Amino acid sequence: MDQKYGEFVGVDNLHAAIIIEDSEENYIAETPEYLAPSAEIAGEAETNNTPTYYDNMPADNYITEGPTTLTITVSGIPADKAAKYLGKKYDAATGRVLDTGEPNPPYCAISFRFNRGKNGYRYYQYLKGTFSGGSEEAASKSNNIDIRTYQLTFTAVNTTHKW
């Protein structure tokens, strides 16, 4: 099979950067930083298809797209980095994320790549969005290892800056 048709067989290089400015004149983001080792990334765009009918048959179809929601599963994120991207407070002296119940996540950009086939890649860049969630759990140790991962939701929206 031609390499450009290869299946997705992996994901890596998950990076994030806080957006400094998103205006009609400028789009400026911090230097991207490695977010965490990625296990799975699944995305779905919110779409709406509206057909119009004339003379008793469909004549046209109008398609709109809303935000894209990505569910990102990683091995774990350092507490300071999780607080930074989830818009929570971080106490560097104790290493604790302080959850006040009022997150204020910054707009940020993310990028990653899917492995395609044996040695190809498909690169993704979402230029603006926010993280939410931070689903995490732990269980008591036992004679079996019970591995738990960390799950984030990234909701991508349009930039103000026109490309």
What name fits each language-model region?
Residues 1-42:
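Polar/acidic, low-complexity leader/linker segments enriched in S/T/G and N/D
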Residues 37-38, 45-55:
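N-terminal "mature-chain" segments and other terminal, solvent-exposed stretches
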Residues 50-58, 87-97, 134-139:
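Short acidic (Asp/Glu) patches
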Residues 57-81, 146-159:
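Oligomerization/assembly interface segments of phage tail-like spikes and tubes
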Residues 65-104:
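Ordered, amphipathic secondary-structure segments that act as subunit-interaction surfaces
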Residues 74-78, 114-118, 130-133, 156-160:
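Beta-strand elements of well-folded, non-transmembrane domains
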Residues 101-134:
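Short helix-loop boundary/capping segments
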Residues 131-163:
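Mixed-charge, glycine-accented linear interaction segment located at domain edges/termini
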